[in-house]
Amino acid sequence: DATALREPERIPMCPMLGALPYNLEGSSYRAAMYNYSEASEALVKFYQEFQPDATTHTGFTSGKANELAQSTMIDWPGRPGTSVPDFSTHQVIENEYMDENEYPELLKDFTGFMLRKYIPRAFPSVNGLADIRFVPSIVLNTTPLASLYSRQAQEAFSLLAKIGEEDAKAAEASNAVSNRLADLGFPPMFTGAGEAPFDIIGDYYRGTLATLTDQLEYPEELEAACDMMADIQIESWQYFKYAPLPVKRVFFPLHKGMDGFMSAEQYEKIYWKPLKKCML
């Protein structure tokens, strides 16, 4: 009823909890990234004790996978050399992974930009992907595949396989504890995730300050990038049409639509318009 904007019999409670369940139940957020069985038990105890109406645990993140990838946009408890304490959630490190002159490349060839520029910058251990490219002339043999079997690319593929194995372990544990909680009467609050397209550019590509500056210096490119991010997300949500999910709700945090940093016209054009496109 509450989701449908009808008056419910009682107020539903399903707060976003972060590291709280682990810390209250004798575990830690570090365990949520490295010791899934311990973290799962903490989650079950927490939900049984406090009885919220739904779970907001969206899945375990693999600390080992992020170590292998040398992830640069977060720091996390358990990473060798980290200063993040075990009880803390991961910490975001905002960087510019795309400079202002690269909007045309992003818009013209999103996949190519991700392979050759974004992924090597955000995950340096797989920078062997940076040389992957295809030349369309004289496709009579395997020559166009050369960049895929270069030594650097093969090293990146081998490491990606190891990263995938670690992420698969996290996904398996996440699904197991989610099913267990559902059987106990705590269904998931969300079965998908997304962001306002402007926030995607600000969070993961240009950084907050650069994105706000781009409103003035590269408004057309920023608007086009936001529209593209809306389309990419809409395509990614098509599974909602077919998958037998217990609920069909998307976790959708809003980060950067701040009236102190954009005019009403800018908000309408580059924040609200692509966000509304995602919603409708």
Question: What role is predicted for each listed range?
Answer:
Residues 1-36, 42, 53, 120-280:
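Active-site loop segments of alpha/beta catalytic cores
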Residues 1-5, 19, 27-32, 68-132, ...:
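Domain-level signal for soluble alpha/beta catalytic cores
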